[in-house]
Amino acid sequence: MLKPNNSWMWYFDLKDNSLMLDLGSDMVFRVGIPAKHLIPSASEQCEFTVDDASIFQNYKENVSHLEISEPRKAELALNAVAASRFHKPMMPKSWFFDTQSVSCDPENSDIVTLQTPLGMAKFIVIENSGCASLCMMVDVEPLALSSTKEIRFCDTIKVMNNRITAYEEDAILNLALVG
């Protein structure tokens, strides 16, 4: 997986209308967040900071156990760093998701699940603002939000925390067999 260094640079590509991350060695990452969801400072060139590297490491560790390919994990972690630094504030769109009976207060970089009447998917928490969280989808398969709308890998959505469930891997994987 990628290892951040002090040569990485954020910049905005006007031709592609996209935030980019120059990774050095002729490698460039195109951030998956639409330009309309980025704060104005995303259009200015700036370095990938020590804070960015620390946040990247947290995301990388929390997605390491997910059943997606290593390149997808790197893509997810880089998009999550970009979202944590450059995503505009947004209003919750909780109506797509089912209210949960158990309250959840997720931490940044936690893996959580959200359920619609049409399915369920895993997300990573980008920012918990108290009663709502900005989340990024981690599942590769799209999740139908309604009959006409879906959310895809690395798309972001803000939801009230009462719609979020903590993600738990199969309990069987966490149990030790005895005797």
Curated annotation (Swiss-Prot):
GO CC, alphabetical: cytoplasm
Query: Cross-referenced InterPro entries, in alphabetical order?
Result: ZapC, ZapC_C, ZapC_N
Primary subcellular site in the record, as a coarse category: cytoplasm
What are the GO BP annotations of this UniProt entry? division septum assembly; FtsZ-dependent cytokinesis
Q: Which UniProt keywords apply?
A: Cell cycle, Cell division, Cytoplasm, Septation
Q: Where is the protein situated, by its record's location annotation?
A: Cytoplasm
Per its UniProt record, what Pfam families does this chain match? ZapC_C, ZapC_N
The domain of life is Bacteria
Q: Quaternary arrangement and interactors, per the entry? A: Interacts directly with FtsZ.
Classification via HAMAP family: ZapC (MF_00906)
Q: In which family does this protein belong, per the annotation? A: Belongs to the ZapC family.
Its job: Contributes to the efficiency of the cell division process by stabilizing the polymeric form of the cell division protein FtsZ. Acts by promoting interactions between FtsZ protofilaments and suppressing the GTPase activity of FtsZ.
- What protein name does the entry list? Cell division protein ZapC
Q: Which organism is it from?
A: Photobacterium profundum (strain SS9)
Lineage per the UniProt record = Bacteria, Pseudomonadati, Pseudomonadota, Gammaproteobacteria, Vibrionales
